[in-house]
UniProtKB/Swiss-Prot annotation:
It comes from Saccharomyces cerevisiae (strain ATCC 204508 / S288c). PANTHER family: YTH DOMAIN-CONTAINING FAMILY PROTEIN (PTHR12357:SF89), YTH YT521-B HOMOLOGY DOMAIN-CONTAINING (PTHR12357). Pfam families: YTH. This is Methylated RNA-binding protein 1. RNA binds at residues 161-163, 207, 231. Residues 155-290 form the YTH domain. InterPro entries: YTH_domain, YTH_prot. Disruption phenotype: Defects in meiotic progression.
Length: 306
């Protein structure tokens, strides 16, 4: 079967099978799958085109070609285009469009599938679109966004407020951190009282930056033998503890203001002080936001970071 390829923006494409499946005996499952794939494709295309001047020029050029060709058939050998020069093959298309040849005409089956589709906790899942978007943006940013992160039950979450971007970078490269005397005491107590297998996660934010910049796991209690001379005023910090950075990327405060902290007079997490503890459920939600938010991917590891 000949495939017809679009000369529109990258990843916006269809084939003749799509047209053939537009029949009266289609199930709701077919329609929802097609719509889901099309929406993901359009969202990703819009973001890529708007944020990449080169792609804008490519899209304009391709549209001009389409006009000149008029009604002539355009084959994939001539005008196939996708980011990273990956061929638009059937296997790639299946990530966005999935069709069933066994059409189920049972209304009950359709209704059951529709209810199941709506009940899925989609906001907790990382879709193919999000995974692919993050893979592409890793080339634009040095951000660290793991596809999966082990967060055991009864883990605890704390906000870390740093006065300096330099201190945060040195923490990343040296794998240690130290708070104030009071903050260190609070974190040490939390670490010692952890249930078996649980962890302590730290949400880092630099004062007056208007954003959070990453997540680190506390992997030791306070130690005297760690080198705190990496910071400008080592006498101020004294003891330190080991950390392992698990996420490095920015999340703007406006995306986090909806998370209210009961132990801090129901103020947003963005108004938290250093070592403010965050409820488990909110901590999980923020981790998911770090992992899945698919716009404005920047990190303090980028050369142009400000």
């Amino acid at each position: 079967m000949n495939q017809i390829w679009s000369t529109g923006p990258p990843n916006f494409y269809f084939n003749s099978e799509w047209k053939e499946n537009k029949r009266n005996d289609r199930t709701i499952e077919d329609s929802l799958r097609e719509l889901d794939g099309l929406i993901h494709s359009l969202e990703r295309t819009h973001i890529e085109v708007q944020t990449n001047p080169k792609l804008k020029n490519d899209v304009t050029a391709l549209n001009d070609i389409n006009k000149k060709e008029n009604k002539e058939e355009i084959t994939h050998e001539n005008y196939t285009h996708q980011i990273n020069s990956i061929p638009l093959t059937s296997s790639n298309l299946n990530r966005h469009f999935s069709f069933s040849r066994d059409y189920n005409q049972s209304d009950n089956s359709n209704n059951n599938y529709y209810r199941e589709y709506l009940s899925k906790p989609r906001y907790l899942q990382q879709s193919t679109k999000e995974q692919t978007f993050n893979e592409i943006n890793k080339r634009k940013s040095a951000a660290i966004i793991p596809p999966w992160l082990n967060i055991p039950e009864n883990s605890r979450f704390f906000v870390i407020k740093s006065s300096s971007l330099k201190h945060v970078k040195r923490s990343f490269y040296n794998g240690i951190w130290s708070s104030t005397h009071f903050g260190n005491k609070r974190l040490s107590e939390a670490y010692k009282k952890l249930n078996s297998g649980a962890k302590v996660f730290l949400f880092f934010s630099i004062n007056t930056s208007g954003r959070f910049c990453g997540v680190a796991e506390m992997v030791s209690d306070l130690k005297m033998d760690l080198d705190t001379s990496i910071w400008e005023d080592e006498q101020k910090y004294g003891k330190a503890f080991k950390v392992r950075w698990v996420i490095v990327r920015d999340i703007n405060n406006r995306s986090l203001k909806r998370f209210l902290i009961p132990s801090n007079e129901m103020k947003p997490i963005t108004h938290s002080r250093d070592t403010q503890e965050i409820p488990y459920s909110i901590g999980i939600s923020i981790i998911n936001l770090f992992k899945t938010q698919d716009s404005d991917i920047f990190s303090f590891l980028d050369e142009t970071y400000e």
